[in-house]
Amino acid sequence: MAKLTKKQKEAASKIEKNKLYSLKDAAALLKVVASAKFDESVDIAVRLGVDPRKANQMVRGVVTLPHGTGKDVKVLALVTPDKEAEAREAGADHVGLDDYLQKIKDGWTDVDVIITMPAVMGKLGPLGRILGPRGLMPNPKTGTVTMDVAKAVQEVKAGKIDFKVDKTGIVHAGIGKVSFGAEQIVDNAHEIIQTLIKLKPTAAKGTYIKGIHLTSTMSPAIALDPKAV
């Protein structure tokens, strides 16, 4: 395990071991312990009482963060020529179809989100082995396969993110930057937690929200009290 730097040790010393913080206190503390010279990303990890191996306990969805992610999301719109102007006006960074499909086949994946149309999905099938592992495959459930391309692009640019429970039962999501105000971090975290609660599978038994941790790129994790969020 890598040794902690002096700054990381100082940060860790400010977080009480075995203490469960309220969301408000955790957000304020996170801004204190963040020590990197760059604007660190803020992430949340929510451990759910589900068995993701069972289809009826899979948790996935989308949420629009009230204050966005703080990240400049790069969007590729794979659309037919009649939709290109619409996609560009909405703010897509890359717009086209066959040229970009070839670029992806050649290994290019320098985007954060791909938005496409139902008629184009057939062409994307063979690229699943490239896009799937990178979380870039468009999906109707997350609103990235749609005829309303402009709306989809605008929502992603405004802070709409999709999430999915991993095989260990944890949902990870980026919810902002350390430069955000503490209240903005609280609002964004609260939004995703409430969305997860609404998505609780009926097959999930026992405690649903088992644990929540807030962290920044370089800081130790801060444990939250699930009852105080």
Swiss-Prot record:
Part of the 50S ribosomal subunit. Keywords: Repressor, Ribonucleoprotein, Ribosomal protein, RNA-binding, rRNA-binding, Translation regulation, tRNA-binding. It comes from the Bacteria. Belongs to the universal ribosomal protein uL1 family. SUPFAM superfamilies: Ribosomal protein L1. One of its GO terms (biological process) is regulation of translation. InterPro entries: Ribosom_uL1_bac-type, Ribosomal_uL1, Ribosomal_uL1-like, Ribosomal_uL1/biogenesis, Ribosomal_uL1_3-a/b-sand, Ribosomal_uL1_CS. Transmembrane segments: none annotated. The keyword Transport does not apply. This is Large ribosomal subunit protein uL1. Binds directly to 23S rRNA. The L1 stalk is quite mobile in the ribosome, and is involved in E site tRNA release. Protein L1 is also a translational repressor protein, it controls the translation of the L11 operon by binding to its mRNA. It holds the Pfam family Ribosomal_L1. HAMAP family: Ribosomal_uL1_B. One of its GO terms (molecular function) is tRNA binding. NCBIfam families: rplA_bact. It comes from Flavobacterium johnsoniae (strain ATCC 17061 / DSM 2064 / JCM 8514 / BCRC 14874 / CCUG 350202 / NBRC 14942 / NCIMB 11054 / UW101). GO terms for cellular component: large ribosomal subunit.
